[in-house]
Amino acid sequence: MSEILADLSGRIVIVGSGLAGLMTALTLAPEPTVIVTRAALGGETSSAWAQGGIAASMGNDDSAALHLADTLAAGDGLCNLKVAASVVAEASAAIVELERAGVQFDCNGAGALSLGLEAAHSRRRIVHAKGDGSGAAIIRPLADAVARTPSIMVLEGCQAQRLLLDGDHIAGLLCATEMGTVILPSSRVVLATGGIGGLYDATTNPVGNFGQGIALAARAGALLADMEFVQFHPTALDSRRRPLALVSEAVRGEGALLVNEKSERFMAEVDGAELAPRDVVARAISAEIARGGRVFLDARQALGSRFAAHFPVIDALCREAGVDPSRDLIPVRPAVHYHMGGVATDENGRSSVPGLWVVGEAASTGLHGANRLASNSLLEAAVMGMRAAHDIAGVDASRAKLPHDHARVVAPDPSLVRPIASRHLGVLRNAGAMHGAIAALLPLFDGDGPAADPALVALLIAVFASLRTESRGAHARTDFPLKLPHAQRRTMRLSDALDIARSAIPYSFARSA
């Protein structure tokens, strides 16, 4: 029997303590909220691990219109224009709010913000905090601010397991703790659970991030969008470390070059060269590796002895792997870094389920389209966290009726899913691989064991990917290498995806026979 935490009834429940979750809670204050986090506050979040900064058009030669144009170009036809225009327009205000919360951004000698350059940006507009340690330097003061705010309660070591419904409305959240399961009664829940990198062997995300928020929302009947678009960062440090360490795009922004084992600069003739959009660079590196080669970043001439001063975190990670980036080539490979798909929301973070908001990487707002522009993720997390808070503040708490019964849920474990997703749902895809993934994932989902929730999320990626018969953005198919003339986003519910998956099983068995 689960304990109902009646003393917390009526509080807004926020699941996750990355940038999106923290900004939601701080913006809602003094409205009573409770943050549910499986780890320590702000810990084990992609936000805290971010090396890149926040994209904001703060330079004299820049504008929101230019930032929007770069965002749309990277998004490859699938961006929601209204959402993208409004988010980039609010970037400067988000920087101001973060500074007000205690974040100290890097400045130049004149006292103005230092602006970095990253791939597919036409201007220097990346705002950093403590260089390539931006994520931690942003999350730390926000977590401190949350700890100082009396209206925010934090439940650490608490794993969200199921959303509870009263009809089709949110009624509460079932969570697992060391002491057993508990229920938080609430008609207003925000999911800020991060991405899906933990579904893959090679990822830069915390390994526990397997798309829990997507699984929660999907089981509650929420609309999902663009699940097929998984961004592989081109330059993860190729080492034995797990998760893989990131070698930020900013290193290429400062002039580092990509070369293969023959010292050939294979990106030289590509539009944008080393600073082409991430999907383009990831595919090029994957092709080099697929032919049996290796790929390296060469920062020796561009940075040399200045590398450690510019990128202290990356320098330390390289040295941990036995590489001196001032003298040595840095071995790199693509790794899952960001998910453009997720729970479909409007411009305020509202999902299709009444009482449920989703912000940050767990959401699919349409900002990123088919391929995220570098450093737009922290921007979206900050802006959408604030927006959702303002939207929620206008919604009165209702007395939802908790269901009498709820299924027993076991702790999730994505280990059985990782080899399937890594093999079949990688940088390059085809029909046989995707149907193979569906055939392997359905039994794990139906088994209702530890792999069920991770399998659900991977299954959604496979189904969405199988339906997109083109190559666009981060979704590249060897059997459909061309882009269709008309770009179209796709949404569906879990029930729809399961119907499609079950109908695909005979095909996959026939292919493997």
Over which residues does each language-model region extend?
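N-terminal Rossmann-like FAD-binding beta1-loop-alpha1 element of flavoenzymes
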Residues: 11-35
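Short hydrophobic core segments
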Residues: 13-15, 184-193
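Conserved N-terminal glycine-rich FAD pyrophosphate-binding loop of Rossmann-like flavoproteins
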Residues: 39-72, 76, 242-245
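Short beta-strand to alpha-helix junction loop
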Residues: 79-92, 126-144, 155, 203-211, ...
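Conserved redox-cofactor binding core of oxidoreductases
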Residues: 99-180, 192, 201, 236-238, ...
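FAD-site-proximal beta/loop scaffold in flavoenzymes
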Residues: 162-172, 176-178, 323-367
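An anion/pyrophosphate-binding glycine-rich loop and adjacent beta-alpha core
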Residues: 216, 222-330, 382, 391-393, ...
